Amino acid sequence: HAARLDVVTDFGTINPGETKKFTFTADYPGAFFYHCGADPMMQHIARGMFGIIIVDPKNDTRPKADREYVLIQSELYPNPEDRQAMMDNKWSNVMFNGGVFKYDPVHDTNATKWLQAKPGERVRIYFVNAGPNEFSSFHPIAGIWDKVWLSGNPKNEMVGMQSFTVGPGDAAIFDLISPKEGANAIVTHSLRAALTGAIAVIMFTKDADPAMGHGEQILVR
């Protein structure tokens, strides 16, 4: 979604053992969804053939982030061959970064990772809703989004948002600051989706791991 291409010549099937390559100029800054464009597209997205492209502004006027994280929301369809279930929106779970309660030790006692920051730090979240069907009402429980940028473009700024809706195939950038120690739970406020897996806990503590939210740890594995 970050590129301006030709849907006929630049999209198509890649056969086993085949490689295709193209380049493009990123004309707009922001956070962008990318995904498999071959038919059946919905099934390929439901199988996880997607990701995020972050295009930083040339002259960044936004406040500097102290930590950065990537969260991608998607739905889990138990049978990857059941295309009708995808058409009927019959998912079993909604996930962040490919895991059910992946960063939520409250709902999954086996979870060993969560997001970390220190009180007062500006935490920037690059968020993509991969879908393929559900909207996300992206919300930080016990917090307020200090700033939100629609599609991640710095010209599309909103301030003091309790939640913000991101449709399937869309993205946004969110800044969160906690003035005190404690936890926020980042969720989609579509609660059926949240309570089946789309919750990520961010712990604000004075002894937060300095590596978290930097380098390879912007995508917590």
Regions found by a protein language model. Give the residues of each.
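Copper-binding active sites and cupredoxin-like electron-transfer domains
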Residues: H1-R221
